[in-house]
Amino acid sequence: MTSKTTASLLAICVACAASAIAGTALCADRRNAPAQAGAGAAAAVSGDAHEQPAAEAPAEEEEETPAVAATDGKLVLPNGQDITPDHMENGRWYTAEDIPTYKIAEEGAVDWATFSGYRRYSAECHVCHGPDGEGSTYAPALRKSVLTMGYYDFLEIAASGKQEVNTAANLVMPAFGTNKNVWCYIDDIYAYLLARGTGDLPRGRPAKREDKSDEFVAQEDSCMSG
């Protein structure tokens, strides 16, 4: 996260989950349980989630991925957000509007932050949302969600959690704003999901990656020890 977004993120961290925008929660559980922070919070709610990850949603039930427009050398999401990489800060790529994004070299190597996002997603998010952002039988495919959900809406729900109640189930998304294993890498996770959603990054572990920069290490150490 850049210094320009610090004020917004502080507000987001204390935001009430009830204020989250209408739409899809980032992580859900079938049981009626309070939102909670911490690594593996969703798994703690469901009991044996680590041993039995959520089943992936059947392919026939998945909605078609929204189109991503490429005009004048720029990538624009269906929500109008430009995700073209513009500059690097703290070892991460950002757009001209300081929104985190990804960059893949011509030979196929992903930037380190996007690779970091893959690792953090696989460690913290896939139990509910399925591997590679593909979704599950009870949680959405985040690779699709990020194409229509704004970056700050993504942060708000990730920080504060969300609860959706309907006639079929009571779905709970835990809050991760105080979980450093997630929050210190939230931009990386977002960039990874963007790369998956646009189709620029295939499923599985990225085959090639850039090296981890000193700037990334410094920011990582500062966040994890803060």
From Swiss-Prot:
Keywords: Electron transport, Heme, Iron, Metal-binding, Methanol utilization, Periplasm, Signal, Transport. SUPFAM superfamilies: Cytochrome c. InterPro entries: C-typ_cyt_methanol_metab-rel, Cyt_c-like_dom_sf. GO terms for biological process: methanol metabolic process. It comes from the Bacteria. GO terms for cellular component: periplasmic space. Disulfide bonds: none annotated. Residues 1-22 form the signal peptide. It is found in: Periplasm. The keyword Iron applies. GO terms for molecular function: electron transfer activity; heme binding; metal ion binding. Induction: During growth on methanol. This is Cytochrome c-553I. The lineage of its organism: Bacteria, Pseudomonadati, Pseudomonadota, Alphaproteobacteria, Rhodobacterales.
